[in-house]
């Protein structure tokens, strides 16, 4: 009996070890802000560098410091000019600067009464349409996802929520309070995170909730090993990036990357 059990466990372990990560050897585009920006070097690797090493993938990184949702299509245009559609997936990691800038949350939809054929009878029904408005947070997200899903209908698109925010000072006129404070339009960071979760459902794009799952909580000094410290408790350091990358790596195990594959390995 013990031999049979040992054999079963061995077979299970061999099966698990034989499963290849679905994102292995992939070509991944990264849009985002300073945490993604390849021009802002951390004392080590960025999260996408870790993922590139672990997955043997090719990263195409277009994130720029300070960017908000309304600037993502500009990053997409640069990508298109450089690599066209020669990639497998897009990750979008942005939103924290929209919160810091006090961008209003806004609405997802507008509604209007229209006449429509229902079972052969013309009736009046209320119809909703996405708000496409760069002056609001949800409007910005709608614009980006509407465009990307139309332009790249066969590509995987993954949203990453912003992580928690602690105090940062990058100059006398660039002081950013921690997330326990409302922003200029009276919203907490939570509202911006929740909107990205909602966008996942509205636009049928998966979301990796780093705000909840990464474990990073720089408001506690005990987690100082994950941030540069001093005047910057906002950006993760190399160890913070590694922890984010670990979370993303394991979440990606549940998501397909190449959507043109006919049968999983």
Regions found by a protein language model. Give the residues of each.
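Sec-dependent signal peptide recognition
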Residues: 2-8
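Residue-level detector of intrinsically disordered/flexible regions characterized by low predicted structural confidence
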Residues: 4, 264-265
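Residues that line or immediately flank small-molecule/substrate-binding pockets and catalytic motifs
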Residues: 8, 32, 94
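A periodicity- and composition-biased signal for non-globular, repetitive helical segments
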Residues: 8-9, 146
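Hydrophobic h-region of N-terminal signal peptides that target proteins for export
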Residues: 9-17
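Alpha-helical transmembrane segments and their juxtamembrane interfaces
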Residues: 12-13, 43, 166, 247
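Serine-esterase "nucleophile elbow" of acetyl-processing enzymes
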Residues: 17-65, 70, 76-86, 90, ...
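Alpha-helical cap/lid subdomain in secreted, periplasmic
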Residues: 54, 75-264
């Amino acid at each position: 009996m013990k031999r049979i059990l040992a054999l079963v466990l061995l077979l299970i372990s061999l099966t698990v070890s034989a499963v290849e990560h679905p994102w292995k050897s992939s070509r991944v585009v990264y849009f985002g802000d300073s945490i993604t920006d390849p021009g802002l070097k951390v004392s080590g690797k960025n999260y996408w560098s870790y993922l590139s090493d672990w997955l043997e993938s090719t990263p195409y990184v277009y994130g720029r410091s300070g960017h908000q949702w309304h600037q993502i299509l500009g990053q997409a245009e640069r990508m298109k000019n450089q690599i066209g559609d020669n990639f497998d997936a897009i990750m979008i990691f942005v939103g924290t600067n929209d919160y810091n800038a006090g961008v209003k949350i806004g609405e997802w939809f507008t509604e209007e009464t229209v006449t429509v054929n229902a079972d052969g009878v013309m009736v009046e029904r209320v119809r909703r349409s996405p708000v496409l408005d760069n002056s609001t947070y949800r409007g910005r997200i709608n614009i980006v996802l509407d465009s990307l899903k139309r332009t790249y209908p066969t590509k995987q698109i993954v949203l990453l929520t912003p992580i928690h925010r602690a105090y940062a000072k990058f100059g006398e006129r660039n002081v950013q309070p921690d997330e326990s404070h409302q922003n200029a339009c009276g919203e907490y960071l939570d509202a911006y995170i929740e909107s990205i979760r909602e966008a996942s459902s509205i636009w049928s794009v998966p979301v990796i909730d780093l705000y909840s799952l990464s474990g990073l909580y720089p408001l506690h000094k005990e987690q100082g090993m994950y941030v540069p410290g001093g005047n910057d408790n906002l950006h993760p350091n190399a160890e913070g990036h590694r922890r984010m990358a670990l979370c993303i790596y394991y979440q990606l195990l549940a998501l397909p990357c190449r959507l043109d594959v006919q049968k999983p390995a």
